[in-house]
């Protein structure tokens, strides 16, 4: 099972945080700090899989860290021992490809200004720590459908707001 998914920039600023297990706010902050320290000090040639084992007082013994470093961002998945490392690496690649399709060459600013859409894309792929979809074409198609629905709703909402402003109660 996937325990958490994080995107952290090179300076340690979290850009996306998704926990599939309940942790207190303090523990979440500890996890973010420890994950950044673990992955940021590794070289480009290092393996992208980390077995935590007994080396941490934050994570369970069976926790594995699987990450990829793209440009200025670390895509980090914390999983239990039942998950395949290679399938999670593929899932990270699928996530990045889906983001690239949706944002036409995704960058860190897209994650900052469109975090709701990033969460939507992630929720198309993973729900409750379980992988739902791994096909970027299907993920992008669902994203496009959602965008069309949002655009169809907005004229109604803005038109309703305009009508409400023109109606003034009699005093």
Curated annotation (Swiss-Prot):
Keywords: Endosome, Membrane, Protein transport, Transport. It holds the Pfam family Clat_adaptor_s. It is found in: Endosome membrane. Its main location: membrane. Transmembrane segments: none annotated. Gene3D superfamilies: 3.30.450.60. GO terms for cellular component: AP-3 adaptor complex; endosome membrane; intracellular membrane-bounded organelle. GO terms for biological process: Golgi to vacuole transport; protein transport; vesicle-mediated transport. Disulfide bonds: none annotated. CDD domains: AP3_sigma. Belongs to the adaptor complexes small subunit family. Adaptor protein complex 3 (AP-3) is a heterotetramer composed of two large adaptins (delta-type subunit and beta-type subunit), a medium adaptin (mu-type subunit) and a small adaptin (sigma-type subunit). Part of the AP-3 complex, an adaptor-related complex which is essential for the compartmentalization of the endocytic pathway. This is AP-3 complex subunit sigma. The gene is ap3s1.
